[in-house]
Every structure is written in structure tokens, then in C-alpha cells.
Amino acid sequence: MLKFEHVTKTYKGGKKAVNDLTLNIDKGEFVCFIGPSGCGKTTTMKMINRLIEPTEGKIFINDKDIMAEDPVKLRRSIGYVIQQIGLMPHMTIRENIVLVPKLLKWSEEKKQERAKELIKLVDLPEEFLDRYPYELSGGQQQRIGVLRALAAEQNLILMDEPFGALDPITRDSLQEEFKNLQKELGKTIIFVTHDMDEAIKLADRIVIMKDGEIVQFDTPDEILRNPANSFVEDFIGKDRLIEAKPDVTQVAQIMNTNPVSITADKSLQAAITVMKEKRVDTLLVVDEGNVLKGFIDVEQIDLNRRTATSVMDIIEKNVFYVYEDTLLRDTVQRILKRGYKYIPVVDKDKRLVGIVTRASLVDIVYDSIWGTLEDATENQEEQADSKTTEPEMKQEG
């Protein structure tokens, strides 16, 4: 799908932003480029659509040399999402989504159908198509930015820190949605980020760069288990190496399959009764098809008990969730580092299937850390033994 052959970018003064880069990226693969500031990751991405042109070497897309392509046509054939989102403020959401199809002279009917089809992919109502960007939240705007990159059915999408400006909860939700969307559509994604957690969560393979060169190009698991050198170890952070058992990889393997839930039409009194019976302070709210809709907690009930009568009156719809095939290490990061008490687990249709709590992770993290300490102790004992036996061997000689 995408191939770099000995690509170098040299700026005036002789500084090499990218130096002799060679790699192959397969069709449908999600590849993250990461490294410290000035490592060449953004320059590498911008050479793909010729916003920056290479000084030496060749880049091929589907075996075609991009330097032989018309740069305007090339860019229209590649999706591009940036951190600033870049929606046109004077255009409706519909007009923003079909901007590239319009440039490609699609029929009006085809453009309208494409806009309706795409808005459904990110669970936004169709009436949003007639709104303007300022009427949407930051997370909703970024969803539209992603849709615009998909609108002309581009197979290759470039993404330059697209979620970097969002708050942590919105960012987590969008990452989860986008990874699921990428799996469903089979697009090839080149994703630049400075966040190792984001790269580990999203990527099929990660390119770690330093000083314009590739230090390691491998799967997240392989990088975590076998970092190429001390730079990679320091960059990814040693704490990530012990946050989960290697043999427990997906949320579904450790989740509680009986989360306490309630439907939105129930009364607050019914909700309080369930909380007392189950000894919980939070209830997940689902519809009749068990699709996750939000949550309520005792604090909300207490604050609204004089005015609200039903669960629907106080439901908090902004709930973070993960899919059942989400890698466990990503969930560990969120619960332990970002302060989540629990995370609901859903299937591909967003039906509630389980819940992961801090308590359910205790054994996993304990075993990981304890195992690491045991290994370290064994190594120290072996070294001590070798030092003890070494002089004895000399005495025998």
C-alpha cells in the first residue's frame, strides 16, 4: 500500500529532518509515528501527500511513485485530519463533510447520500448536517473532521495529532470510536502522535523515531516486551511493561459480566432500591435492548431529588466505555492513572456486556509487579552465586 525507499529530507543549512528512511506499510494497517519533538515524524507524514517534498528517495502508494502524480489530485485522493480540525465556519456540517466530493464533481444526490451515511457511523443525528461548526462541541467537531477525511472514499488517511486538543474523557471516547471505525472500514491510517499511550492503544504497528531515523518499527506488544534499546525503554516508560499480565490481553477476559443497570423509564425510588440491594453507588443506564445510554449516581440523585422523578431526568449521557476486545493494558492505564472507578464494557452494537472496576485489576497489577520483583530477586541471587563461586573455581585451578 505505502512504501518508503531510502527517503531523506534535507533543509537549507544541511539539517536532515528525515534520514534514509525505508519501510513498508500494508493495506488496512494502522501505523503510528511517534518520537520526541524534531524527530521527523510530521515531516515524514507530510511527504506522503507532498505538502513537503523529499530531497532523496522515493515514496510509492499502490506501487505508483507519488512524484509522478499531480499533487492536487494526489491530495484529493488522501484523507487528512489535523489537530485544529479545520472545519469551514461558514459552511454547514453537510457542506464540510462533502467538500472533497464536491471538488471531485460528485453528483448532488451522491453527495447527500454520502453525508447521511457517514454521520450515522459516528452516532450523530442526521439533523446535525444542517448545523454549523460553532453549534457542536469540540468532540463532535473532531468527529466531523474524521468523516470529512473519509468522504471521498479515500483508502489512505493521514492524521496529525487529531485528538491532542480534546479533554481526556472526550479523547478516550473518540480514540475508542475511531479504532472501531477503522477496523470496520479497513482504511490504511498513518497517525502522528506524541502520546505513547495513544499509540499503544490504536496502532497495529508503531514507528519510533529519533533524529530523523527509525529506532524501532514493530507491534505495540513486541515494543513493550522487547524494546530495541535504552532510548525506547525510556521513551515508552518502564511502568508500562508491568501494568498487565502478558497472557491476559483483552477486557472480556477479566470483566464482571453482571453489571448493575437500570432503564431510563424507571423512577428514582426504584433506582435507590436497586442501589441499596446491590450495595453500589452508581447505576449504568440502558435501553430495552440493553444498549448503554449513560449512568446515574447517588450524588446526582441527592442534588436533584426535589425536582427529578425518573432516571431519565438526571441521566449523565457522557459516559466513557470500552469494547470487549479492547486490550487490557489500555483499560489499566485509564483506571489507575486517570482516576476512573469503573469502565463499562460494550459489544460492537454498544450493548452493555460487562464492567471493569479498580478491584478487578488489583490481582493483575499485583501479580505483574510481584512477578517483576521476584525476577529481580532471582537475578540478584544468581549474580551473588556467580560471584561466590568464581573465586572457588580460581582456587581449584
UniProtKB/Swiss-Prot annotation:
Q: What class of enzyme is it?
A: translocase
Entry similarity comment: Belongs to the ABC transporter superfamily.
Q: Which reaction does it catalyse?
A: a quaternary ammonium(out) + ATP + H2O = a quaternary ammonium(in) + ADP + phosphate + H(+)
SMART domains in alphabetical order: AAA, CBS
This chain belongs to which protein, by name?
Carnitine transport ATP-binding protein OpuCA
Entry keyword set: ATP-binding, CBS domain, Nucleotide-binding, Repeat, Stress response, Translocase, Transport
State its role: Part of the ABC transporter complex OpuCABCD involved in carnitine uptake. Probably responsible for energy coupling to the transport system. Involved, with BetL and GbuABC, in osmoprotection and cryoprotection of Listeria.
Which Gene Ontology molecular function entries are recorded, alphabetically?
A: ABC-type quaternary ammonium compound transporting activity; ATP binding; ATP hydrolysis activity
- Keyword Secreted tagged: no
Question: Is-annotated flag, keyword Lyase?
Answer: no
Subunit and interaction comment: The complex is composed of two ATP-binding proteins (OpuCA), two transmembrane proteins (OpuCB and OpuCD) and a solute-binding protein (OpuCC).
SUPFAM superfamilies referenced in this protein's UniProt entry, alphabetically: CBS-domain pair, P-loop containing nucleoside triphosphate hydrolases
| A GO biological-process term | glycine betaine transport
